[in-house]
Amino acid sequence: MAGFGAMEKFLVEYKSAVEKKLAEYKCNTNTAIELKLVRFPEDLENDIRTFFPEYTHQLFGDDETAFGYKGLKILLYYIAGSLSTMFRVEYASKVDENFDCVEADDVEGKIRQIIPPGFCTNTNDFLSLLEKEADFKPFGTLLHTYSVPSPTGGENFTFQIYKADMTCRGFREYHERLQTFLMWFIETASFIDVDDERWHYFLVFEKYNKDGATLFATVGYMTVYNYYVYPDKTRPRVSQMLILTPFQGQGHGAQLLETVHRYYIASSSVLDITAEDPSKSYVKLRDFVLVKLCQDLPCFSRERLLQGFNEDMAIQAQQKFKINKQHARRVYEILRLLVTDMSDAEQCRSYRLDIKRRLISPYKKKQTDLAKMRKCLRPEELTNQMNQIEISVQHEQLEEQFQELVEDYRRVIERLAQE
């Protein structure tokens, strides 16, 4: 019996030691993957140029780890404009194949699932491609040029936005490289069917000089799908939008979204512009752009705003800027906050009630549904449903929603003031 206890203790300790040993070979793929946009040869050794994914779960599972390596580095370096790629896997040590019957993850195979063939694996080949980068030019039609002040007070940076499609020579291959970034920065990203001609592509590039030549660097892009609306209209829907990490916080998202809106505004066949499953950050960006577009419309004058939302606002927003009624309502709420003195009790109360009347609509629908349920539910089922829409809880949720909205709206107003 004592011998059995000693054996059991040994097995527990052995298992613990093995697990500890195996844990040393687990790497966080969010930090193991190193991304870089290269303009100059010295960028290869410059850690400041390195940035990292926000998500890796689509390739490496929910725990976002790779097993079997110590000191794992997955290098994905892109030439800044053409996005010609160098892919290499480096590590200090790899788990022995005979070590407790475990195998290292096929890291290279996982990355190959999303990057197109034709990439480099060594620095010399990559630098040879970099020497030819002056030949790269943006795809498609130039829509907009704008500048961003230099943080050091030097010459402004110049950026351009283009609209492209798959008929542009070389664009299909370029897009295959560009879309790989989606997997690292959009949580639910997926690749689109590029053979569907209803996709539109909008690209942002930085225009810069290098050794007397004009070059272009990829900044970000947006894909838009054109849905048919009976009988003769289309509804462009923003599907994917990404500004690459080194360029974030510089206003490129707003420039891109406004340019896309202005592109579709010119088309009489477009009904309105929407977005597919928009993130909170996208909604905030859209709020800013739409308010900026609408703020000078007569229907959004101070006098009209204080009278409440009306059909004319929805009509004008749709006709002038292809904005649907729901988004026009948000524009109204932001602009009304702008002209409301929230320190004035009466103005504040009026604004609060106006917003809450909209927010309460889903709760009223639940009340209507409950009235119908009374006719067919058993008492215990009815009690359960009533508990879900308790009045006091409704008021708390409404107030919380209201405060969150006002906070978001104030940020939009602050950004408008900086324009």
Curated annotation (Swiss-Prot):
The active site is at E276. The record marks W199 as: Interaction with histone H4 N-terminus. Its EC number is 2.3.1.48. It is an enzyme of class 2 (transferase). GO terms for molecular function: histone binding; histone H4 acetyltransferase activity; histone H4K12 acetyltransferase activity. It catalyses: L-lysyl-[protein] + acetyl-CoA = N(6)-acetyl-L-lysyl-[protein] + CoA + H(+). The keyword Electron transport does not apply. GO terms for cellular component: chromatin; chromosome, telomeric region; mitochondrion; nuclear matrix; protein-containing complex. It comes from the Eukaryota. Keywords: Acetylation, Acyltransferase, Mitochondrion, Nucleus, Phosphoprotein, Transferase. It is found in: Nucleus matrix; Mitochondrion. One of its GO terms (biological process) is subtelomeric heterochromatin formation. Pfam families: HAT1_C (PF21183), Hat1_N (PF10394). Histone acetyltransferase that plays a role in different biological processes including cell cycle progression, glucose metabolism, histone production or DNA damage repair. Coordinates histone production and acetylation via H4 promoter binding. Acetylates histone H4 at 'Lys-5' (H4K5ac) and 'Lys-12' (H4K12ac) and, to a lesser extent, histone H2A at 'Lys-5' (H2AK5ac). Drives H4 production by chromatin binding to support chromatin replication and acetylation. Since transcription of H4 genes is tightly coupled to S-phase, plays an important role in S-phase entry and progression. Belongs to the HAT1 family. Catalytic subunit of the type B histone acetyltransferase (HAT) complex, composed of RBBP7 and HAT1. Interacts with histones H4 and H2A. The interaction is dependent of the ability of RBBP7 to bind to the N-terminus of histones. Component of the histone H3.1 and H3.3 complexes. This is Histone acetyltransferase type B catalytic subunit. The gene is Hat1.
